[in-house]
Amino acid sequence: MNNKTTLSVANPALHRKKSIVLAAGGTGGHLFPALALAEEFEDTDIDVHLITDLRCKKYLPANHQIEPHIFDFHLKMTGLANKVISLWRLSNVCIKTLLLIGRLKPDIIIGFGGYTSFPSLLAARVLRIPFIVQEQNCFLGKSNRLFAKSARIIALSYKETSNVSIYDNRKVVITGDLVRSSIRNLPIKNTFDNEEFRLFIFGGSQGAKVFSQIIPEAITELLKLNPGLKIHITQQVSQDDQKELSTIYYQLGIKYLLSPFFHNMAEIYSETDLVISRSGASTVAELVNVGVPAIFIPFPYAMEDHQYFNAMAIENSKAGWCFRQEDLTAHILAQKIYELVANRTMLKEASKSLLNRKNNGAKYLADTVLKIIE
């Protein structure tokens, strides 16, 4: 009698850890939503890989649990020689990314738009890995449009995004903004009745210079319209402009704080009545989460004018105000600030409308990812 014992050997593939790849970079506006999504997987056994570029390496938090893969995506598409070099460099990155993703074998790839997501989404198509495109702006960018047809899901931060093909609408999910917990948990602005009107002005890395020119003129005119106004200005300025602005504000007799960069954003937001800023995705998402209304001056050279579409989505929901840079004068800006100072109810209503847009988009998208890979 043969008493052989048959051993059951588990299939290692059935017990392989799940993994995802996030492809984001170029600017913080593309990277920060990816970091927000990565946070949602920190307490899971899912491995999170990030494919990004050298420029965005500095944005990675010190305590992150992400496996970063950093490539040189420096592209310069002006002049024939630069275009040839950039296309060669992009081709090289595409090959390296294809080999990397082939080795990682992720269960899904999420691309956050911009040229840095292109190689990863291309690899996903070649290797037949399911992927999601996520658009944090109110206008579907080139890279996301290119891959939308093949994507499993098109995740949008704005319900107002209108340039999605009618054939792709069935794949659209509206997540809302993807923001990191450090932003999502900022205190909400709850009063606009302080005697001192507090203005926070920042232009980001793309355009603080023009603000340094037009804001002082507008404030000078504002104080002529309302001589007794108590105002405090917190403004992001370059080192080159700091001395000149300091002199102007000092002569106007107003309180001010000038700096090239601010680390205490939570404190500043909690004390601010009105923001004047660009309308990049990250800026708008922060203001939505804290409920601080803004006058938006979109960066006029943003890719496909997406900052204008972001700002108009906010204005159309009565949550802020938008002025194109080429149409804005110190007089127009002074008149608008004067109107808002005189009628604080407008600020309160705008704040409520902003907060109505607030949700946890990162969790929503994380749940969507889990449904696909599990």
PLM segments and residue spans:
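C-terminal alpha-helical cap of glycosyltransferases
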Residues: 2-6, 339, 359-374
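Conserved nucleotide-sugar phosphate-binding/catalytic loop shared by glycosyltransferases and other
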Residues: 16-25, 42-89, 239-241, 324-326
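Donor-nucleotide binding loops and adjacent catalytic segments primarily
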Residues: 42, 49-51, 56-64, 187-274, ...
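An amphipathic, basic-hydrophobic alpha-helix
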Residues: 79-108, 126
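Acidic donor-binding loop of glycosyltransferase active sites
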Residues: 106-108, 270-285, 292-293
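Conserved donor-nucleotide binding/catalytic region of nucleotide-linked donor-dependent transferases
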Residues: 321, 326-360
